[in-house]
Design a protein with these regions (language model features):
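Cell-envelope and extracellular/periplasmic
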Residues: 1-265
Length: 265
């Protein structure tokens, strides 16, 4: 896990009988924290992945679940998971007050299920389109232009940085996105196909054709910007993606309470 801090920890520990006698003087030592032999998951998507829940709940840290924050430092995973303090990649910095995220519980659940330490890498960003997560070179980008303040491919570069920092391999992607694309008829209709392309790009990047994606259907929207029809279209696209793309899984969120017009609580 410590490769994200630009450190590689490798040593050959001999038996204690070969160590210097402590009576001969001080022995130099180094303490290296947050090392685990386990699995690393990438957290990507928009604000409901970043975490904006406002009601406190019992969701304590777990000693075997760690988080690589936006500052590229490892800590015991705790809310808020997408804190932008000292971020190393400002492209995904969220500068609003963060709240609780579903992915601390995801980490503890994976830890119990797999029986090993879990590392989470936070790269999500609120108010983003799928086109920002696709590579700028993806051939569908020209068909679905984004507003000027949402540069195509901007979040894909963050994904590349995060994957490279852990040696190019991760165990899976936790993905929660789609609210922005649901505002646009064409993007909503094309979402399943374009998401399949995103999955393919990430799997190619990680050299793992079976890399799992754990996705969440969007909840409803009550801000007047996105209609119930569009939300339903997006949820159906996300359901279809999980049926059509191998090792893409989906869970619903439309039964969750909300903290405001678009965010889960």
């Amino acid at each position: 896990l410590c490769s994200l801090c630009n450190q590689v920890f490798a040593d050959d520990l001999t038996s204690a009988t070969d160590w210097p006698d402590a009576g001969h003087g001080a022995i130099p030592s180094t303490a290296i924290y947050h090392i685990g032999v386990g699995e690393i998951f990438l957290i990507a998507g928009q604000s409901n992945a970043s975490g904006v829940g406002k009601t406190p709940g019992f969701d304590p840290p777990h000693p075997l679940v760690h988080l690589c924050r936006n500052s590229l430092t490892w800590t015991t995973a705790a809310h808020p998971t997408n804190d932008a303090t000292d971020t190393a990649h400002p492209e995904n910095a969220d500068f609003y007050l963060p709240g609780t995220s579903p992915y601390l519980r995801f980490g503890t659940t994976m830890c119990r299920a797999l029986g090993c330490p879990i590392g989470l890498i936070a790269v999500s960003k609120g108010d983003t389109y799928l086109g920002q997560w696709l590579p700028e070179s993806d051939e569908t980008q020209a068909q679905y232009p984004l507003p000027d303040c949402y540069p195509a491919g901007s979040l894909w570069r963050v994904v590349e940085m995060a994957v490279a920092a852990v040696g190019g391999r991760i165990a899976g992607v936790a993905w929660y996105q789609g609210e922005n694309d649901a505002d646009d008829d064409a993007m909503c209709t094309a979402y399943a196909e374009r998401f399949a392309r995103f999955v393919g790009h990430v799997r190619t990047l990680c050299r793992d054709s079976a890399l799992p994606f754990f996705t969440v259907q969007i909840n409803k929207a009550t801000d007047g910007r996105t209609t119930d029809v569009h939300c339903g279209m997006m949820r159906e696209a996300q359901r279809q993606a999980a049926h059509r793309i191998p090792r893409v899984f989906v869970v619903p969120a439309h039964d969750l309470p909300m903290s405001d017009a678009v965010h889960n609580n």
